[in-house]
Amino acid sequence: MIIKNGMIIYGDEFTIVRSDVLIEDGVIKEVGKNIRAPADMVIDASSHLVIPGLINAHTHVSMVLLRGLAEDVPLQEWLQNYIWPRERELKRKDIYWGTLLGLVEMARSGVTTFVDMYFHIEEVAKATIEVGLRGFLGYGMVDLENREKLEVEIKETEKFYEYVTKINSPLVNFVLAPHAPYTCSLECLKWVSKKANQWNVPVTIHLSETKKEVEEIRKKYGMTPTQLLDEVGLLNEKLIAAHGVWLSEEELRMLSSANATVVHCPASNMKLGSGVFPLRKALDLGVNVALGTDGAASNNTLDMLREMRLASLLQKVAHLNPAIVKSEEILKMATVNPAKALGLKSGVIKEGYIADLALINLRRPHLLPLNSPTSLLIYSARGGDVDTLFVNGEIVILDGEFLTVNEEKILDKFLKVIE
């Protein structure tokens, strides 16, 4: 496979080059001009920007089912009065078709990899394989300090671990997924810590999303949520903590020292009125910061191109400083940084890296002129501009059409499911 004459965002410094890309066995074999090699397919990318596949480091894909369900309310009310009651009604088939729809939406914004926690998680895995994206998936554990509930959550988590091991798919990876320090008991968190070491897998969790959450944890345990994770053995390089809006400077230093990752979810944090993540401070302290959409119920899209734009604009207006964050830093949060968190040799277009690539069609009115490809990607591109997508060197979308699934069938089935 050769991608010919594209405008390439090359390497981890995002150098712009007009070049070809040779893909062999799912890996980028060569990047250079006028590549001459045997190829089963040649794609003309002369009118395209070729970018690393984006990584959505925190989402709940099947929550597209709940898009628009509850608006203009704070997080706790949103969860307790709207989301959790509706989730109790969802069946396996709902999760399956909801995931398919969400994956199609994500793919069209250039997402090749995502991190997801939810229930009926086997259905998420099945849909992930069908569409051809790469998922790091976990059963969302919530025990609310109920011993019987904890036993159920442990059983479900172990069952999914066995499922992932059995199917042995390169597209489905297991993560442990305790929901949050305020919904999981100490016993639950300690069990997760033990299993993370035993199974050598990442741990994704919601952390310091709201001011109220931090105050409740302080009152209950006499420490911050980050200190609590440290206490139970979860503060390490395996940790992928979502939101982090109310992290203190001390906690950011702790996360940096532990080589943990924080996932910034700007749209969700703005929509729920949770606050503004201290991005500049986190980056300056050496925290590995990734980017995520959260679920479509609190965003309300899964468009990672939009999320990059919001991440940049939010910091500029919050600090009244247009230079506070650079486009290249934002792009790293959607590529290089989450790849590091997941131990994935992806997020970069370079020889030896996994061929996760997205081609953006530049022949669109809102994408011209091409003065700065990187800033154009951050501030002008949007979901739907991606017309070709590779995951592991396999084509998922070609010239705007899915090769792996029937998009129209998914739309029809989804509409029937939500009737």
Swiss-Prot record:
What catalytic activity is recorded? S-adenosyl-L-homocysteine + H2O + H(+) = S-inosyl-L-homocysteine + NH4(+); S-methyl-5'-thioadenosine + H2O + H(+) = S-methyl-5'-thioinosine + NH4(+)
Q: Does the keyword Zinc apply?
A: yes
> InterPro entries in the record, alphabetically?
Amidohydro-rel, Deaminase_MtaD/DadD, Metal-dep_hydrolase_composite, Metal_Hydrolase, MTA/SAH_deaminase
Q: How is the cofactor bound?
A: Binds 1 zinc ion per subunit.
Entry EC number(s): 3.5.4.28, 3.5.4.31
Q: Which Gene3D superfamilies match?
A: Metal-dependent hydrolases, Urease, subunit C, domain 1
Question: Which residues are involved in binding Zn(2+)?
Answer: H58, H60, H206, D294
Q: For substrate, which residues are the binding ones?
A: E87, H179, E209, D294
Q: Which UniProt keywords apply?
A: Hydrolase, Metal-binding, Zinc
Q: Which PANTHER family match?
A: AMIDOHYDROLASE-RELATED DOMAIN-CONTAINING PROTEIN, AMINOHYDROLASE SSNA-RELATED
Give the protein's biological function: Catalyzes the deamination of 5-methylthioadenosine and S-adenosyl-L-homocysteine into 5-methylthioinosine and S-inosyl-L-homocysteine, respectively. Is also able to deaminate adenosine.
What protein is this chain from? Answer: 5-methylthioadenosine/S-adenosylhomocysteine deaminase
Q: What is the lineage of its organism?
A: Archaea, Methanobacteriati, Methanobacteriota, Thermococci, Thermococcales
Recorded name of the encoding gene: mtaD
